[in-house]
Amino acid sequence: MSRDEKNATLPHIRNFSIIAHIDHGKSTLSDRIIQICGGLTERELKEQVLDSMDLERERGITIKAQSVTLDYKAEDGQVYQLNFIDTPGHVDFSYEVSRSLYACEGALLVVDAGQGVEAQSVANCYTAVEQGLEVLPVLNKMDLPQADPDRVAHEVEEIIGIDASDACRVSAKSGLGMEALLERLVRDVPPPKGDPEAPLQALIVDSWFDNYLGVISLVRLFDGTIKKGDKIRMKSTERAWEVGEVGIFTPKRKETGILRAGEVGFVVAGIKDIHGAPVGDTIVHAKGGEDVARLPGFQKVKPQVYAGMFPVSSDDYEDFRDALEKLALNDASLDYEPENSDALGFGFRVGFLGTLHMEIVQERLEREYNLDLLTTAPTVIYELAMKDGETRYVSNPSKLPDMADIEEMREPVVRASILVPQDFVGNVISECEQRRGTQLDMLFLGSQIQLTYELPMSEVVMDFFDRLKSISRGYASLEYNFERFEAAKLVRLDVLINGDRVDALATIVHRDHAHPRGRALVEKMKELIPRQMFDVAIQATLGGQVVARSTVKALRKNVTAKCYGGDVTRKRKLLEKQKAGKKRMKQVGKVEIPQDAFLAVLKMND
């Protein structure tokens, strides 16, 4: 049976994705589905097939959306084409999820039958329901002794509000219940709507850059067909290209020569310009595509956290820029602009979704593009109301205008929803209070409690997620959205080394935290700056006021060692000479600040 006949019917296509929290077994479940449908041979089936980046494997998290097309022979004798789009589960990557969901008609909500529901799955599940997807609850890890499916099914109903009485109970690890799950999938997820005869309309779900092929785009066709050799046009750039390769992922790339309405696959059109196929764009045919509407893609995500990134050697600047461009293609939420710093030279101010995203981007740049990078402390965007009535936005502390010209500073506030087991509620509440949070709501849901807080974003992005995990033994989960800008008493904390301001070490902090923060910072820097031949003074200042100071003592050579007894004036002469030399050195001497010192600012836990 040729592929053409087999895929002639829309009713036999099922597009779905998996929603799950970190560690609830999403990647194992997808491995198992691929194995059952024979997408890979036993030999090729390594753990977490879809996590293709080394980094994803090491950290055990999914970062990028991936897709697989599988053929499943159901009990009714029909062969169904399952298009499965993998989604990440970490809070920093929620935009990836909304993108993947847009291309599907159904979603499997995977919940760990031992742990219960987590905040991130709740957020993603709401997104799925809003987009009109059919959500099937799946209780995973049924082979574990601590699995308690009835309690968890009850939690799913209470917290998310979807019927979980007949949820699929599976163990992806042992393969228990997997066949039944696929049958449910085929039965309950609606087939895609679309007309293969209509003009082409396709959505770019993801793009990445290949050095040989140019831009490869993962697309979902809503109407029409796309064949090798077709002339296509991107709606946003209005540029036309000729299709070089069309096909599906099985997870490997496999050319098929044609994609029809309702299918998910890849398109390569020899686009060498990185901005040629932006994610979320609509593809139409070059001829007659003018009347086709643009698909309501997904809103461009605004970065929440900014940090300066600088190549360690200034010769790498061009390579760094190329690397950022290629990465930004694959990661629609990266935002960057050139920046230069007195201490670190030329680099970029890069915007991220959160600190995990920042670490991952830095690691990908260093691994995939062999760059050595310095990263400054992450900051959020502040809104400044100036005295002349204009409003400015600042994400870089060293670019803050003079305090005398600022009427008021406003910091971004987020609304955070935290799900936590009852035993740890006290810890979480006191952590939120410490971070200047205001409690809005507290709901008891089965054995878990949902806390709703308003917190300053600067407190959340630094290390809140890690702290939350550690005070709740890993059970608490967090999901947050930007609410508004709110006036706050904010000040800029500068670090002076030997009287020179180091712009890369400046941070914006709340006035109440300025003294302890300044002290901690100075102490930390003292440990990290190597001793010089002269005293190095480290000061933390607010405006003109020094709030903390410490000195790295000079190394000293014993110049009087060669005098055996004798006249004291001779010794004094040598000591005076040494003193004068040190003084001269201090005026011209430059203090090298090691990379660790910049990182110390990132890891400052009050």
UniProtKB/Swiss-Prot annotation:
Pfam families recorded: EFG_C, GTP_EFTU, GTP_EFTU_D2, LepA_C
A GO biological process held by the record: positive regulation of translation
Disulphide bonds in the chain: none
Keywords associated with the record: Cell inner membrane, Cell membrane, GTP-binding, Hydrolase, Membrane, Nucleotide-binding, Protein biosynthesis
Record field: catalytic activity: GTP + H2O = GDP + phosphate + H(+)
E.C. no: 3.6.5.n1
Gene3D superfamilies tied to this protein: 3.30.70.240, Elongation factor 4, C-terminal domain, Elongation Factor G (Translational Gtpase), domain 3, P-loop containing nucleotide triphosphate hydrolases, Translation factors
Keyword Cell membrane: yes
Domain annotation tr-type G: ranges: 11-193
GO-annotated cellular components: plasma membrane
InterPro entries per the UniProt record, alphabetical: EF-4 (IPR006297), EFG_III/V (IPR035647), EFG_V-like (IPR000640), EFTu-like_2 (IPR004161), G_TR_CS (IPR031157), LepA_C_sf (IPR038363), LepA_CTD (IPR013842), LepA_IV (IPR035654)
Protein location: Cell inner membrane
Membrane topology: Peripheral membrane protein
Protein residues bound to GTP: 23-28, 140-143
Signal sequence residues: none
Family statement: Belongs to the TRAFAC class translation factor GTPase superfamily. Classic translation factor GTPase family. LepA subfamily.
Chain's role: Required for accurate and efficient protein synthesis under certain stress conditions. May act as a fidelity factor of the translation reaction, by catalyzing a one-codon backward translocation of tRNAs on improperly translocated ribosomes. Back-translocation proceeds from a post-translocation (POST) complex to a pre-translocation (PRE) complex, thus giving elongation factor G a second chance to translocate the tRNAs correctly. Binds to ribosomes in a GTP-dependent manner.
NCBIfam families named in the record: lepA, small_GTP
Protein name per its UniProtKB record: Elongation factor 4
Organism in which the protein naturally occurs: Chromohalobacter salexigens (strain ATCC BAA-138 / DSM 3043 / CIP 106854 / NCIMB 13768 / 1H11)
Lineage, top ranks: Bacteria, Pseudomonadati, Pseudomonadota, Gammaproteobacteria, Oceanospirillales
